[in-house]
């Protein structure tokens, strides 16, 4: 299946799993914002340290604005394959199209590592 138009780079499975792990750790020891509206606000305010976007969002327009907004605000972002998995990592019983890590807590080093690897992928 072709990737949606808002997916600007390929994320290795291992890195996507690290991103989900970072969301879980930040949920427990830091602060996250769940859902596209909260994520968008966190990016616009410059609060987000890392934005995680699901690749299976339909319609695409729900999250299509996030990659250019993150680039404008110089906030790293990464894709994960499943909105269901992203929702679960964020502690929700429903799917989440996107999540923003505001304070990574104990996931700080992991978030920094992911941000560095994402910069490499975007080149």
Curated annotation (Swiss-Prot):
Belongs to the eukaryotic ribosomal protein eL8 family. One of its GO terms (cellular component) is ribosome. It comes from the Archaea. InterPro entries: eL8/uL1-like, Ribosomal_eL30-like_sf, Ribosomal_eL8-like_CS, Ribosomal_eL8/eL30/eS12/Gad45, Ribosomal_eL8/Nhp2, Ribosomal_eL8_arc. Pfam families: Ribosomal_L7Ae (PF01248). Keywords: Cytoplasm, Ribonucleoprotein, Ribosomal protein, RNA-binding, rRNA-binding, tRNA processing. Part of the 50S ribosomal subunit. Probably part of the RNase P complex. It is found in: Cytoplasm. This is Large ribosomal subunit protein eL8. GO terms for biological process: ribosome biogenesis; translation; tRNA 5'-leader removal. The gene is rpl7ae. One of its GO terms (molecular function) is structural constituent of ribosome. NCBIfam families: eL8_ribo. Gene3D superfamilies: 3.30.1330.30. Multifunctional RNA-binding protein that recognizes the K-turn motif in ribosomal RNA, the RNA component of RNase P, box H/ACA, box C/D and box C'/D' sRNAs. Its main location: cytoplasm.
């Amino acid at each position: 299946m072709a990737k949606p138009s808002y997916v600007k780079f390929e994320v290795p499975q291992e890195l996507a799993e690290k991103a989900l792990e970072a969301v879980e750790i930040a949920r427990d020891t830091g602060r996250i914002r769940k859902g596209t509206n909260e994520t968008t606000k966190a990016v616009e305010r410059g609060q987000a340290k890392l934005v995680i976007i699901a690749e299976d969002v339909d319609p695409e327009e729900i999250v299509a604005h996030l990659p250019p907004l993150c680039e404008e605000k110089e906030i790293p972002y990464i894709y994960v394959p499943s909105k269901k998995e992203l929702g679960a990592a964020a502690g929700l019983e429903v799917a989440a199209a996107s999540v923003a890590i505001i304070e990574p807590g104990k996931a700080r080093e992991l978030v920094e590592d992911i941000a560095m690897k994402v910069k490499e992928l975007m080149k």
